[in-house]
């Protein structure tokens, strides 16, 4: 909302947008706000928040003669938008929840226009609570709406004004008998009517009764009824102490008047002067309990609240109320102001738990019966006269303006807004700016009560009328949803965030409301609705429902909230979608309450230039755990789009598309409809397709159905087995999508064009917000940025804080002697309670949570968009690319590339490495930046596949099971030369002598191909680690960079580096690229992917420990290790600490450093041989060489073996660092039998 742009309602720019509260008012509600006694507290700013608006509103109340009052309903009808309001409110502390509800209501009432001269209450409902009847307004033209009942003493003013209640007085010709006086009126006019049992009676002119005698209506029941959703439609105006049926007749009226119904009068209708309301007293009247059935001692006077106390009472029975079910007692003070107006204020008194008023249901029924009398016709009608039949036979007549132009509940809501605007902001003799009117309207649009929404509902114009208020609050206690921890909690100090949020929702769109052409050509045969498909939030209308869906899917901002009803973290990309979600709760009778607001801008390239993809059918996706509607973020070559996933309980299989030309009858075999994988018999072709597409357990001996050779996730073991044979080109050629058995000549064509099998990909669903991402890198970045909390930990004590200033203040107050120290950043996992000190550890920890979150997504063959459902992708192909199954030439030219190729989409290449490993696009960076591999390492598969690629792919391979598959036409070539010829002849592409089997790249030499496969497809990088950096493993992409780093950072000459380390710096140079050395290198490389643990030993190279330091640095004992390390590191008198890698000029300096920093004292022994000083203790090596030596691996029972995953480490420090990557939550789950390795 906030985008309504109807020209005649520019001055109402937010009347049906955010009528509840303004940005300046969203953060001021607190128990410290106090007002003066008697309801005349300090005037608060109206919704706009400036004093000028208050003065203008007061002037509007004091001067009833306004040029704009000529017509009560002279405004044209804007688009019908049932108002849905969103307010971000604060909570101070949980124990103040009860007081906060009252205070917030007070502020909202004041924002709605209460002034010293004449408070105008508003029956707003904030934070899920309905407000009580507001105080009285002296504006005579205030139609009966939720902004307060407007009535005044016209005898005092001496003017002939529009009296809303004149028609309900006794007419001499009809009912000369007056009403008997009330039995109990303690002070002048306050009513305390007894309970009643007369049925409700309300009669039109014919005299049939529908309303009960108003003199017998208890105030508690009437007040409890006053905030029903029907009056939020603009039909009646309620006042304090009056029911919806009899709203507006004061409690202090003379005997001929009752607390009866207040109806909207026809424009310009003058009330007869026979029924002015005279206030009997100008001093504050006696306070008495009128809000509840039971009586209790009055409480001390508190601030006037015309919006919260009775709201609490009403919300006690509401399903959405978070407070206790105790009925709230209120007392109403009637005060005659100096100008002759009577003002009522409502204050809350303590009450004991008692049953609510038993006759509220009857009030609801009577209200419903009355509202059904208002006809809804497309043409204007004259005033309708209705009469109230009282219990003693007295009949009161009144004129009701028919709801003639209200087509649905939204327009009724707008009518209420327009009348409320006139009731408050139209001054006499002064021109009021649209801004002032708008600010007043924001506080006066009527709200609804959840209880009434649940219990009643009525039909108006053939449509269901519901309330339209939505409250977005910060609950007193944190939401229990899975995403509660993520995001920043709104507090009083975050007023700028709340203000920005309200400004966004209240902002006026500079563009006019879109109106489509609803007159299509006759030959189109389109049946369009009369008003098109309209967004109820902003008023834009569209010709097609798909256009409306795209309108809701546009990306203009990122709003994250925690919906307390859904108990989940939700992400919205525009305010219309946010308010649409609120409307869904409203339609169920609930009031949306949210917390933990986080707003972020959306990048320009993600905001524009991307087609909005929405599902056009309620299509099926595999029934995975998750919400019913969630956005999909597909990433491919920078394109990001959003979509909507609709989960359907019964999944309909997607049948193959018809081929052009049609396939011959012998192309496929569908004779027996028996699954060739599991021998299950199916009934027909659709049953066979459903058998292959339904979710099922993984294949035997496998933990998932993710193909290790291509980035594809299959639904079940039958589909997985059939897909595996497509890589080996073995019979039977069974389609993994539909289960058909095909001939080899037609198999690839069927997979490519009919079933679009190669469009499957692996996606990852965020466990916190259920957003689906196309790559593991993107979801890890999303979780770290959106859901993980970062704390500033005190370096002295275990305290941690959310902000650096708080940590600094803690240091200043608690540890004044350590002010020079800085707080440490720690990172908390959003999916468990594990805390990490380094981001790489947290990123590695995510792998354990993301394995169960893998889902199957579908990539468009012609563009980089991803879809959660195959049917949605087919609709996208049909509507966007205009050819259904786009020719696969476009696939090769577009971003899709070879569908079996993981290189075209780096974020999804991870599956080919380890079923969910991170992408290798950062493979050239240091290991601090690279992401760790998956905890499922299928290393035997890697070795086997790498052997195929390294040998057969280079030597030609014969016709082995490897072969080459064309990424453009998916044709399979057993020989390398045949593949090169095919690419040049069929597609005009020049391919080098050594093409890669997993992507389109080709190379001139076999080593280049092997390096490409190792780095890009297996994720095993050839890195050059620095053995002198012990605080963190530093790796480099080339030997030259490593040597420069050692020379500059550690001060070692280049000669020592080259002579001492030889070929062991590079993990296998070109001279040792083949043979056993390559296998050793692969083993060590595959173990070096984890950034925070050292690699386990493998085998020893030539030149063992005693080769004078020219061999690799893997030793059987710490003494031999230190001897060789010192021989390498000490050159020209330079001493280096073996614990931290720092270099020193003398052994004495090194000794002092080791004693001060590492607490290692001198000890006799071999230290002198090591050059460490006399008697200095030799530190054990903290780092080990990845090349591997002949030192044995730790035994399974060795204390250096990880008890969780069995990984062996060579030092307790490395074991401890590695063990922290698992997290305690993961370890507990594994010990309980629910975790995966």
UniProtKB/Swiss-Prot annotation:
Pfam family, one: zf-C2H2_ZNF592
A GO term for molecular function: DNA binding
Taxonomic classification: Eukaryota, Metazoa, Chordata, Craniata, Vertebrata
Protein name: Zinc finger protein 687
Entries under InterPro entries matching the protein: Zn532-like, Znf-C2H2_11, Znf_C2H2_sf, Znf_C2H2_type
Primary role: May be involved in transcriptional regulation.
Subcellular location(s) of the protein: Cytoplasm; Nucleus
One GO CC term on file: cytosol
Similarity comment: family membership: Belongs to the krueppel C2H2-type zinc-finger protein family.
Residues that bear Phosphoserine: 104, 142, 228, 243, 252, 254, 266, 271, 374, 433, 495, 1058, 1083-1084, 1086, 1107, 1184, 1191, 1211
Keyword DNA damage: no
Compositional bias of kind Polar residues: 93-102, 136-146, 225-245
């Amino acid at each position: 909302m906030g985008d309504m742009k109807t020209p005649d309602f520019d001055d109402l720019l937010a009347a049906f947008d955010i009528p509840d509260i303004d940005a300046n008012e969203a953060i001021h509600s607190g128990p410290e706000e106090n007002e003066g006694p008697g309801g005349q507290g300090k005037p608060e700013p109206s919704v706009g928040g400036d004093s000028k608006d208050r003065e203008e509103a007061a002037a509007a109340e004091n001067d009833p003669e306004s040029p704009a009052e000529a017509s009560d309903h002279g405004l044209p009808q804007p688009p019908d938008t049932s108002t849905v309001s969103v307010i971000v409110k604060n909570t101070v502390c949980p124990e103040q929840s009860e007081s906060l509800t009252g205070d917030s209501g007070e502020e909202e009432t004041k924002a709605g226009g209460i002034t010293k001269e004449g408070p105008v209450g508003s029956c707003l409902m904030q934070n899920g609570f309905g407000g009580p009847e507001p105080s009285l307004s002296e504006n005579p033209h205030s139609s009966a709406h939720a902004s307060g009942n407007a009535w005044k003493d016209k005898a005092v003013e001496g003017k002939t004004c529009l009296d809303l209640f004149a028609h309900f007085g006794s007419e001499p010709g009809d009912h000369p008998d007056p009403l008997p006086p009330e039995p109990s009126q303690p002070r002048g006019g306050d009513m305390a009517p007894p309970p009643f049992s007369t049925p409700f009676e309300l009669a039109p002119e014919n005299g049939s009764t529908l309303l009960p005698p108003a003199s017998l209506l208890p105030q508690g029941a009437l007040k409890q009824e006053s905030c029903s959703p029907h009056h939020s439609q603009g039909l009646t105006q309620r006042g304090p102490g009056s029911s919806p049926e009899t709203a507006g007749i004061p409690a202090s009226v003379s005997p001929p008047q009752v607390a009866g119904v207040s109806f909207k009068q026809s424009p310009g209708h003058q009330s007869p002067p026979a029924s002015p309301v005279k206030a009997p007293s100008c001093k504050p009247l006696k306070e008495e309990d009128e809000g509840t059935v039971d009586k209790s001692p009055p409480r001390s006077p508190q601030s006037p609240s015309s919006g919260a106390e009775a709201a609490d009472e009403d919300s006690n029975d509401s399903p959405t109320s978070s407070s206790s079910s105790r009925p709230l007692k209120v007392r109403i003070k009637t005060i005659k102001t100096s100008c002759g107006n009577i003002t009522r204020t409502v204050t809350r008194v303590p009450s004991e738990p008692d049953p609510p008023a038993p006759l509220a249901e009857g009030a609801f029924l009577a209200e419903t019966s009355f509202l059904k009398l208002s006809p809804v016709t497309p043409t204007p009608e004259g005033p309708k006269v209705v009469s109230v039949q009282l219990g003693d036979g007295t009949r009161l007549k009144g004129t009701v303006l028919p709801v003639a132009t209200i087509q649905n509940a939204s327009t009724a809501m707008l009518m209420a807004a327009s009348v409320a605007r006139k009731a408050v902001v139209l001054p006499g003799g002064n021109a009021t700016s649209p801004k002032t009117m708008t600010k007043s309207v924001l506080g006066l649009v009527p709200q609804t009560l959840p209880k009434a929404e649940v219990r009643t509902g009525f039909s108006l114009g053939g449509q269901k009328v519901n309330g339209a208020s939505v409250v977005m609050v910060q609950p007193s206690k944190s939401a229990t949803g899975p995403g509660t921890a993520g995001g920043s909690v709104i507090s009083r100090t975050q007023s700028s965030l709340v203000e920005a949020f309200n400004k966004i929702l209240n902002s006026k769109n500079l563009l006019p409301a879109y109106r489509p052409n609803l007159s299509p050509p006759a030959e189109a045969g389109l049946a369009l609705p009369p008003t098109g498909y309209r967004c109820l939030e902003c008023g834009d209308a569209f010709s097609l429902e798909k256009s409306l869906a795209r309108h809701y899917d546009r990306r203009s901002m990122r709003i994250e909230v925690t919906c307390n009803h859904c108990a989940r973290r939700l992400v919205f990309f525009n305010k219309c979608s946010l308010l649409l979600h609120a409307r869904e709760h409203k339609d169920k009778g609930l009031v949306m309450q949210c917390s933990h607001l986080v707003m972020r801008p959306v990048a320009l390239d993600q905001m524009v230039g991307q087609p909005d993809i929405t599902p056009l059918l309620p299509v099926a996706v595999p029934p995975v755990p998750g919400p019913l509607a969630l956005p999909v973020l597909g990433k491919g070559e920078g394109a990001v789009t959003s979509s909507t996933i609709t989960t359907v309980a019964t999944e309909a299989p997607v049948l193959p598309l018809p081929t052009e030309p049609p396939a011959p009858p012998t192309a496929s075999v569908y004779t027996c409809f028996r699954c060739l994988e599991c021998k299950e018999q199916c009934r027909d072709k659709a049953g066979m397709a459903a058998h292959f597409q339904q979710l099922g357990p993984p294949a035997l001996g496998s933990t998932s159905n993710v193909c290790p050779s291509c980035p594809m996730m299959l639904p079940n073991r039958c589909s997985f087995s059939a897909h595996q044979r497509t890589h080996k080109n073995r019979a039977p050629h069974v389609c993994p999508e539909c289960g058909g058995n095909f001939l080899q000549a037609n198999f690839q064509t069927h997979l490519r064009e009919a079933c679009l099998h190669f469009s499957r990909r692996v996606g990852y669903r965020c466990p916190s917000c259920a957003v689906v991402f196309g790559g593991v890198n993107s979801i890890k970045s999303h979780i770290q940025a959106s859901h993980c909390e970062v704390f500033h930990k005190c370096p002295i004590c275990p305290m941690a804080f959310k902000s650096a200033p708080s940590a600094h203040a803690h240091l200043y107050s608690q540890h004044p002697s350590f002010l020079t120290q800085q707080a440490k950043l720690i990172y908390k996992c959003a999916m468990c309670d594990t805390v990490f000190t380094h981001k790489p550890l947290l990123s590695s920890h995510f792998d354990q949570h993301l394995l169960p979150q893998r889902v199957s997504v579908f990539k468009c063959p012609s563009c980089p968009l991803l879809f959660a459902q195959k049917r949605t992708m087919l609709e996208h192909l049909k509507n966007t690319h205009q050819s259904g199954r786009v020719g696969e030439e476009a696939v090769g030219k577009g971003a899709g590339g070879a569908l079996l190729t993981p290189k075209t989409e780096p974020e999804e290449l991870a599956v080919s490495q380890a079923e969910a490993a991170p992408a290798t696009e950062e493979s050239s960076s240091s290991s601090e930046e690279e992401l760790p591999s998956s905890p499922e390492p299928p290393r035997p598969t890697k070795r086997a596949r790498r052997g195929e690629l390294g040998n057969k792919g280079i030597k030609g391979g014969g016709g082995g099971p490897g072969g080459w598959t064309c990424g453009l036409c998916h044709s399979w070539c057993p020989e390398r030369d045949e593949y090169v010829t095919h690419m040049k002849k069929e597609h005009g592409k020049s391919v080098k002598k050594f093409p890669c089997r997993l992507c389109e790249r080709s190379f001139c030499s076999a080593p280049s191909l092997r390096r490409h496969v190792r780095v890009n497809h297996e994720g095993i990088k050839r890195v050059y680690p620095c053995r002198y950096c012990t605080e963190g493993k530093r790796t480099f992409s080339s030997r030259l960079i490593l040597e420069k780093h050692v020379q500059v950072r550690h001060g070692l000459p280049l000669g020592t580096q080259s002579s001492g380390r030889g070929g062991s710096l590079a993990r296998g140079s070109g001279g040792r690229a083949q043979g056993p050395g390559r296998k050793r290198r692969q083993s060590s490389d595959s173990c070096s992917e984890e950034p925070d643990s050292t690699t386990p030993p493998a085998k020893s190279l030539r030149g063992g420990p005693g080769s004078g330091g020219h061999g690799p640095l893997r030793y059987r004992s710490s003494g031999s290790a230190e001897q060789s390390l010192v021989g390498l590191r000490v050159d020209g008198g330079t001493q280096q600490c073996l614990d931290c890698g720092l270099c020193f000029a003398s052994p004495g300096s090194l000794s002092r450093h080791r004693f001060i920093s590492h607490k290692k004292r001198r000890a006799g022994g071999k230290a002198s041989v090591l050059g460490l000083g006399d008697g200095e203790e030799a530190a054990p090596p903290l780092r080990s060489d990845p090349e591997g030596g002949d030192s044995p691996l730790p035994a399974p029972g060795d204390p250096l073996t990880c008890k969780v995953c069995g990984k062996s480490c060579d030092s307790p420090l490395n074991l401890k660092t590695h063990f922290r990557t698992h997290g305690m939550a993961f370890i507990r789950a594994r010990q309980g039998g629910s975790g995966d390795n």
